[in-house]
């Protein structure tokens, strides 16, 4: 009953750490912030200890060494002033959270063709503008994190590979749980 008009990504979820991270082994046994089943599973697959902490509690958790590292966006790092308590940032883009704008399919179908075309044209323009804004803002946030004293470094090939492997593992776990319909969705996505 819904029609997707457009979606736009937030800046990617990246790795913040209180020590340098060169390989996945550097994360083994560390205390990683988790705030939902997905982030908990990522921590488990990295062999880190998941610690449930909400963003609003992260400053205190860092101050008390309750967590050593976490995944969040460059935007959250700037807006929450995480640079005051943590020193290393790696743009691993573990995932790209998205906002989606949808419309009721019946309502859309009730519009005349010219109005449907106008809505779709406006949606395409909004999506393009949104993606450009997200990318621009991410670059600005990264510059600000560095200006505030954080080391902003590209993740090593080993770290990139580990996050890719985790993505594949979690996708396969989801497909297994979702069944044939889930497999069809993933297969269609991979064919794009």
Protein language model regions, located:
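N-terminal secretory/targeting leader peptides
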Residues: 1-192
């Amino acid at each position: 009953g819904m029609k997707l008009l457009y979606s736009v990504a937030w800046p990617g979820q990246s790795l913040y750490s209180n020590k340098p991270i060169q390989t996945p082994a550097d994360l083994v046994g560390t205390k990683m912030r988790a705030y939902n089943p997905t982030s908990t599973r990522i921590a488990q697959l990295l062999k880190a200890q998941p610690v449930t902490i909400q963003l609003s509690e992260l400053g205190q958790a860092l101050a008390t060494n309750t967590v050593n590292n976490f995944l969040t966006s460059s935007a959250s790092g700037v807006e929450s002033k995480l640079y005051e308590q943590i020193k290393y940032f790696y743009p691993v883009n573990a995932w790209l959270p998205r906002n989606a704008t949808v419309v009721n399919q019946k309502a859309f179908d009730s519009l005349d063709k010219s109005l449907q075309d106008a809505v779709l044209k406006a949606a395409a323009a909004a999506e393009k503008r949104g993606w450009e804004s997200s990318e621009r803002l991410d670059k600005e946030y990264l510059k600000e994190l560095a200006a505030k004293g954080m080391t902003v470094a590209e993740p090593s090939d080993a770290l990139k590979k580990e996050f890719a492997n985790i993505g594949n593992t979690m996708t396969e776990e989801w497909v297994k749980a979702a069944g044939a319909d889930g497999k069809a969705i993933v297969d269609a996505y991979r064919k794009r």
